[in-house]
Regions:
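Short acidic/polar mixed-charge low-complexity motifs
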Residues: 61-64, 137
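N-terminal beta-strand motif that seeds the catalytic metal site of vicinal oxygen chelate
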Residues: 1-21, 30-37, 42-45, 89-94, ...
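Core segments of cupin and vicinal oxygen chelate
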Residues: 12-62, 101, 108, 122
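Vicinal oxygen chelate
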Residues: 1-2, 11, 78, 94, ...
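Exposed loop/turn and edge beta-strand positions of beta-sandwich/beta-sheet ligand-binding modules
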Residues: 5, 52, 88, 125
Length: 159
């Protein structure tokens, strides 16, 4: 027996409609389906009492996101981005063709851009920056010259 494939990456959100719009309109994810989750099995699986939750699945480039919105119990936490050295999920990277133009689109939509993270690596020709989804989940945008379909690690290999 072995792991067969990646299923999805789950993100807890406070406002489903706002988050679906953000991931769809700004990041290009395509909504697939929606499910309602509740009942004793859900309570046991999620280790939460009285679960009442909506999940919307979105997909882009073979990556599926599962956005979780809890009516009960209410979501906890704040909208501050997690420190990169905090254990667990750190950030999702999206490759873009023109970082500066893409940032203008995100800013125009009210996205919080962490301007102090904007970095240019002349040796690689790359530019990077972090921004936050509507609930503070870190998203890294990167512009790398060359074939956009070359996996990130291969782009930097041997340099």
């Amino acid at each position: 027996m072995s792991v067969l494939r990646v299923g999805h990456l789950g993100i807890c959100v406070s406002d489903m409609e706002r988050s679906v719009r953000w991931y769809r309109d700004l990041c290009g994810f395509r909504p697939l389906t929606e499910v309602h989750v509740s009942g004793a099995e859900s309570d046991q699986l999620l280790r939460l009492p009285g679960v009442d939750q909506r999940t919307v699945f979105l997909e882009r480039d073979g990556l599926r996101l599962a956005l979780f919105a809890f009516a009960h119990p209410k979501p906890v936490g704040d909208r501050e981005p997690r420190p990169m050295n905090q254990l667990g999920f750190a950030a999702m990277m999206l490759r873009v063709d023109d970082l500066d133009a893409t940032l203008e689109r995100f800013r125009a939509a009210g996205t919080r851009v962490l301007d102090d993270t904007y970095t240019h690596h002349p040796g690689y020709g790359s530019k990077l920056v972090f921004l936050c989804d509507p609930d503070g989940t870190l998203i890294e945008l990167i512009e790398i010259p060359g074939d956009p379909y070359t996996p990130f690690g291969q782009t930097y290999a041997g340099r």
